[in-house]
């Protein structure tokens, strides 16, 4: 009966650790194996009323808990997928740029010429031209209106993943409104350029985070084009404070 004296205290400890749950029913079995000169005793402890995959105490001393339930694994998997999705948004799916259609890729890169040429011309000549800077801002305003129209047109088709709801259609009008406000600051190019930069950033945020339904290659292309356009506008703003101002149109006295 020595094996019963060994098992009963163990069962009592397990019962105390699992309170207020139902008591643990244990069955102790003894198997004797006889060899030439020794006998070996093996004691088995079976828990009948609790599943194996359950959040229990890892040791009898109660140091910490190990979560092994299926619900915990599922929740952890969802959290990992969410974090991975956020990281994908931060990377802007740059690797998918190689899948972009050639016309979209080439026309998008060619659309950067009006942005880049303005600060490049100022750096080469060593002068700041207000007319060139305003032409750059006006081009940026037209691009903002184009981006808003793209979102609107993407939500119109019946099979589109973006639905024509209030969120999609309302947010698509924000870039156009910022473009209109920028054009009102004709005599103050600095404020106009800041509005265009804000509009480009907001439009990119909508497309990548708030409304991430565009193809991966388009999001990658949008990110690259937006970054280059913003830096070009910032370059023109820096040139306005570095180089002397010179007008391209001769002013009559």
Swiss-Prot record:
Transmembrane listed as a keyword: yes
Regions crossing the membrane: 104-124, 137-157, 165-185, 192-212, 223-243
Membrane topology classification: Multi-pass membrane protein
GO cellular component assignments: membrane
Chief subcellular location: membrane
Short name of any one Pfam family annotated for the protein: DUF3429
The keyword Nucleus appears for this protein: no
Subcellular location: Membrane
Keywords on record: Membrane, Transmembrane, Transmembrane helix
Coiled coil (residue ranges): none
Annotated protein name in UniProt: Transmembrane protein 69
